[in-house]
């Protein structure tokens, strides 16, 4: 089953953000709040729940009155098209079944929970995952591989892989030589 990247065919994409009060969640919220084809219907977090979005995030235009809920409350929202998980490393993979995602929902995980094969995941993150859940996820950069998406569970590449892939994509079309990328990072990795 091939799914088309949602924004291409939907006029009003209904979105949820789990982990909306962390760095990744906040940045995603800022981007989606201004997107003409997106309506944010749910903001989840582990703390700062029951607060209005405007009390934590300045500059919002369309999502100011949303109440931040507990991440697990997503179970009660049946009309969400896409759920973005911006939760800390390991939280989604350890608690996947508790969220009870709907069959019609697409889930895009922005953590590293489903990026690495099991042996490397345990080595680097010390987290054991459910193999059946891991198999549902496809590690793919949708912006460059829309037609190759074969699942509703997307494991989005991290900042390094994304910045490199997006930067060299145009060059890759015209060059036949090997491209070497030399990237550096500070302590945070962000």
Task: Show which residues each predicted segment covers.
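N-terminal Rossmann-like NAD(P) cofactor-binding subdomain of oxidoreductases
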Residues: 2-190
